[in-house]
């Protein structure tokens, strides 16, 4: 049995003072959550080392951002309370919330301070535990201001809070939402007369008494009142990502260009990869990441508030260089425990995580039966296979990046491998049946659609169903039948074909899908 990598144990000790016990050994070939078959010893070691990095529980000292939704990759990609009860890379019932609003010119506002309408309200990701990990650190208390709790004498403002504030003289606080705007801002505390009052100096003298609001950043982000689009988005399982990463771009572009039946079209989401090269996206519900590295770095940044350097690859500047502030509000300077600027996660650890994810084996389908074989025929005749394309072959001579900036030797387990993810990796208009999402169009590119979604890869579908995870992007479809019927837009004719099936054909189709 493989031992936990020694560097992982040391890493855990460095990351936080209250970490759980070391996890079980990484799964081996053939085990659920194990690596691809046929890996060399050196590649297996990369998988095991990356596993140790993937399951780290982050805290503010090591770079967990103030705008975090969770404390580690495993929470969204592990299907368990922790690594002792789940499997790294697995599906999860954890979902994220995205928000934004339409502008008057029908462009979309991500409420993140960018674009034509630069309103920064912390969008488009709502960070459900923002600041929670910071509340026990000096300078990070979060308290409400009493309804009449802001008064002024000369230039000295006294703030009265509804609970013990825990602030100290000299520390910076953020006063937000107090009725008279002149009381709001970031200030150094001049005195602390009691545990529910503190004072600061304000250059705006003779302001009327006011109150309400907070002396804090919010304990967690909330959906802003002016947001007109709110979407729940499920976390994805990570099995087989390295195979998908190595689908030739030309194959995805060919899918987009192909003539299709039943009114189906589909578009590739052409975006810049981590090196600035425009390529079709392959990962994410909106196909907003080209590579495993980009997918991982974006998740680290958007879900954990962890910034990432891109200097190892020769690209200018940083990949995700600047932390977002909760609700778009400045974070108190006294509450910045991170000592790892400019990036929170080292390039080496980013590479280790992508190595682990790239070497994760896909979940194999169940052995075929006469019913599932018949169901596959129905799958094709109904038109499901137009968007859920079965097979691809990876490119030749695949290598992975190393922590030193070089490349591994060729990995046969990722090279010229035929596999079956069941997706065209295109975006399709799903109509009103699957609307409510944040648009896929990048900032500043004009019109956006809420109803465009990738064709979800169907491999591993049985695993999602076994863990009682709902289907579709928001997890609200509780069965395969419900998910199929919810398809609209481009898929309307295919849904009609499905509804017209005999009971036998329908049962066979569902059995086939349940076997994936």
What are the residue ranges of the model-derived segments?
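Periplasmic c-type cytochrome electron-transfer domains
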Residues: 4-142, 216-516
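Small/polar beta-strand repeat architecture
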Residues: 142-219
